């Protein structure tokens, strides 16, 4: 991997005598944690989630608790992405990550995990194939990856916890969901029959449907984590299993 010259990141890696960062963990791991790209500490140590990031991860795993031996830890991009001034940046999805992706794909073929956990916004956007994904809004939600034939969940990256430590509670909550998922052994989720009320006529149909129910549930999606102050994106209703 250190001989890789597939993209422009190889030049900065060789110039600084840094390393490409391989994945690490158990090749029988049911859980794969993956970030978009490594940082300097990971490149020097040739180990993903090294340094302070690893300390945050260990604290989260201890709080759950979840055994580290159940994890394979990796990066979509194997080299440290730097800007023109030599400062760390996120990997470019359309170039650097795509050229590096065969390494990750091969590893997933070998491991065949039950769930891939995307650490941070960039990794979640790429693995889900949805640029509109937002880690603050979509963290902890379970999706299905047709490409990797396993489930996918996004969680906060440890760098977010280092900047805003109170967010560690959300990371712990999400990892508890992952543990629960493994214990229950859920299968691919059934498609939900959604009706989207984008105009007045459809809205009236939905309201008419709701008025006939003895009970229903609802969920409010907002632009952030504080539903009391953030703007409302949509209000979802369900009046039966796999309907909304």
What are these regions (language model features)?
Residues 1-186:
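A polyanion-binding, active-site-adjacent surface
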Residues 41-42, 46-48, 52, 57, ...:
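Conserved RNase H-like, two-metal-ion catalytic cores of nucleic-acid enzymes
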